[in-house]
Amino acid sequence: MKAGKHTLLKKFSTFAVAVSLSAGILAASAQPTEAATTYQVGKVTYAKDYKLDDGTTYFTVKGKFPQIKEDSGAAKKINQALTKEKNRVIRQWKTDSAEYKKDAEELKKEELTGSEYGDEITYKVYSNDENYFSVMLSGYVFLGGAHGTPYRSCLTFNAQTGEKLTAAKAFGISKKQLNQKVKKLYLDKYDKKGKEAGFFPGMNAKDGRKQLENNLKNMDFNNNFYVKNGKAVFYAEPYAVGPYAAGFISVSATIQ
């Protein structure tokens, strides 16, 4: 049984929300990640199996989250934001589990068998220098069907102050200017590579570009970015500007 469309939309749009950590298994690791060059980074893990009354597991979640192992003022601010994001994810899992339980109980009532739902998150630090600390949380949720759905949440900080940055703030421009800039980058990419870049194909090149313009019209990239090698990498979710197989189609711009 496939979950409703609103469930997936909720997964992307709310990515979300805080919860008591006693609901699952939480452990801090002392092992730093290879990416650490300025801040020493460890990981916090979380895992929980949601079960029916008869003990059948219907939803399994696993998460690995970053945590800076320093106590400077900037590090504390970054950790507060990282912890908030981690708790949002765990809270969302708890919220989703109630809906998924209904699916599992319905299948059981009809004496049908379905695939166990699952959601797993890992992280990767893309920048850890004197300018930026930028990390991506990458998730993959499986709710039955031919394949699951990938999603991500990125957080970028001023490494000196610990301030969480939007893309507009990083570039020193308005949110409107930022989105105009990014949308132009996508259109330029289409002009150079067309459907070879993974965009939805149109009836012809002109039709495909128009379709991309329409898809980009209401998209906001102010938080859909991470920093790598001094560049802001912006991304669009699967299906936003291209088919599932194209994944996260991205463009980048050097931060001046």
Regions found by a protein language model. Name each.
Residues 1-34:
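Sec-dependent N-terminal signal peptides of Gram-positive bacterial secreted proteins and lipoproteins
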Residues 31-256:
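Compositionally biased intrinsically disordered regions enriched in Thr/Gly
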